[in-house]
Amino acid sequence: SSAASDVYKRQTLAELANKSAEANGFETFLHFENCNIFEHKDDFCSFAHVVSNPPYSENDLPSPNPSKATAHNYKQAGLAEWIRFCIKMIRPQGYFYMINRAEALEDILAVLHGKLGEITIIPLYSKEGQTAKRVIVRARKDSKAPLIIRQPLIIHQADGSYSKEAYAVLREGAVLD
């Protein structure tokens, strides 16, 4: 059995991810499958960590790139349904993680309210002095701990290179608290 599982809606992406895991020696504990999460009824309450990077918009400006258009727009279900599905997949005391647009935060928190606690919000700023375009939300099942807003993670320096903190997370595997 895998230590980590991931699902992709597109078969080609699942295959590519499995090939990458194998090429890097991770095939014994990483597994990627092709399925529609809303039709995937197995494994309820079985994951310690559920990480989600859902489509960002119901009607985002469509990209000319079909892969990006699919990734950015949810057509089958809205964000609330997506989050409720993720919550079902988390085992007791498990964690939920999501990255999404900052303007979706109110909707995300509304779905989490009363279901998950220990909610932590990390605003993501493209550059210092700008407002958050994305947020990372972490929450825990069966927790009543209060909401925490962390310091923002600034992704790029003025010259466009990664900030020290972002580089550590993206390239060195540092953990966001």
Predicted regions and their residues:
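Short, small-residue-biased leader/transition segments that mark boundaries at the very start
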Residues: 1-8
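Conserved SAM/SAH-binding beta-strand->alpha-helix loop
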Residues: 10-12
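Conserved SAM-binding loop
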Residues: 17-21
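Conserved SAM-binding strand-loop segment of SAM-dependent methyltransferases
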Residues: 25-37
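A short acidic, Gly/Pro-enriched loop at the edge of an enzyme's catalytic core
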Residues: 39-50
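Mobile active-site "lid"/loop adjacent to the S-adenosyl-L-methionine
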Residues: 45, 54-81
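Conserved Class I SAM-dependent methyltransferase catalytic core
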Residues: 76-132, 136-137
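SAM/dcSAM-binding transferase cores
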Residues: 131-177
